[in-house]
């Protein structure tokens, strides 16, 4: 009979040998670093870490998508990595909220909680280039706090704006502008709806995988810059409601407050630009953003009439491939990215963005004025003539 203690000791030795061997393999595969001229050991470790974590599991399809390697500073000519807008909307039609397995991320993504990576992100922000951040403690707190019951309670006392569309497309329109422009007919209807009812519809849309031809509802709320932490939005998102300049609000005096958009599966916000630096925090769910630099303005069919209710928005239906082809989208530069809960996307001033809600989603953003050198403004003025700050 084999002694129990001897057998246990033998098993333990085998376990230690196996785990030790695995540790050695992992060390050589993952934790050895490459020596770069002019790059510190710490920075080199970050670069290798980015290779190890160059993929992520998408919350929608559980498909592993690739991510680009981490950059310490903006390269002169190789970032952003563009594809043609026609290729972008053809490979993944905006009317389809399901990400294809071939989707690749090309936009930089930095760890906000890491001081070194945060310094990289600051360089990209100052260069007016788009990027994403993650591991932001204040934002992660909100992603956990804003569950259904919390939002239902808070929304009882919040003012909201709800739009209805017979399809999944929502063209922005301003009811305060001249409605007589070309016998203007609003593209969506304003409706009265309680948040609880809207949430039920949004959750059902995910469950049944609603199509682009069904009626959609877009729920919007927000607070002004003068809210001063009075509402739950500015209290919970204090990074966007600061009295002192920070990474997210670089010019408090020009802060536009906080706008929150509650989206349901498939909702498309048509392409447009904003005149301020834009930090977009994804609180729940995920959205797809297609970005275009300001110099592409002339090719995007942007409404230039300052009196038009949909001023600064594209009149082109990007999900209509025939329109995209005839409008020359094959010569338009585009970036395609998915922003997931807990991430913040930086959209530089005057960059165009086209937004698709991939599922029930909550997104809050804050804009804080144009960059010091006014990057992007000249291209927009050459394209549209007079430009109204927005």
What are these regions (language model features)?
Residues 2-344, 352-390:
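N-terminal accessory scaffold of Fe(II)-dependent oxygenases
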């Amino acid at each position: 009979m084999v002694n129990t203690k001897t057998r246990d000791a033998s098993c333990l030795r085998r376990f230690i040998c196996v785990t030790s061997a695995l540790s050695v393999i992992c060390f050589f595969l993952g934790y050895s670093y490459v020596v770069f001229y002019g790059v510190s050991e710490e920075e080199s470790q970050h670069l290798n870490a980015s290779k190890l974590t160059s993929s992520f599991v998408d919350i929608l399809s559980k498909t592993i998508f690739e991510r680009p390697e981490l950059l310490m500073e903006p390269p002169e000519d190789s970032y952003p990595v563009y594809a043609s807008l026609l290729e972008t909307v053809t490979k993944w039609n905006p009317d389809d909220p399901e990400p294809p397995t071939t989707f690749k991320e090309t936009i930089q993504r930095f760890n906000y909680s890491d001081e070194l990576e945060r310094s990289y992100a600051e360089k990209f922000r100052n260069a007016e280039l788009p990027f994403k951040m993650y591991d932001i403690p204040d934002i992660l707190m909100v992603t956990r706090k804003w569950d259904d019951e919390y939002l239902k309670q808070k929304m009882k006392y919040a003012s909201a704006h709800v739009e209805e569309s017979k399809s999944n497309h929502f063209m922005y329109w301003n009811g305060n502008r001249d409605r007589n422009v070309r016998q203007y007919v609003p593209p969506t209807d304003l409706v009265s709806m309680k948040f609880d009812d809207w949430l039920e519809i949004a959750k059902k849309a995910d469950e049944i995988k609603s199509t682009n031809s069904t009626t959609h509802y877009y729920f919007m709320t927000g607070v002004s810059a003068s809210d001063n932490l009075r509402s739950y939005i500015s209290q919970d998102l204090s990074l966007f409601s600061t009295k002192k300049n920070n990474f997210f609000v670089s010019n408090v005096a020009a802060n536009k407050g906080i706008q929150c958009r509650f989206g349901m599966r498939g909702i498309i916000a048509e392409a447009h630009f904003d005149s301020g630096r834009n930090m977009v925090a994804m609180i729940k769910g995920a959205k797809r953003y297609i970005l275009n630099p300001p110099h592409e303005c002339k090719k995007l069919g942007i409404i230039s009439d300052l009196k038009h209710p949909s001023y600064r928005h594209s009149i082109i239906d990007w999900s209509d491939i025939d329109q995209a082809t005839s409008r020359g989208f094959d010569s338009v530069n585009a970036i395609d990215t998915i922003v997931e809960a807990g991430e913040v996307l930086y959209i530089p001033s005057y960059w165009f963005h086209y937004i698709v809600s991939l599922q029930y989603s909550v997104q809050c953003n804050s804009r804080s004025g144009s960059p010091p050198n006014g990057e992007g403004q000249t291209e927009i003025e050459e394209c549209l003539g007079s430009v109204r700050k927005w």
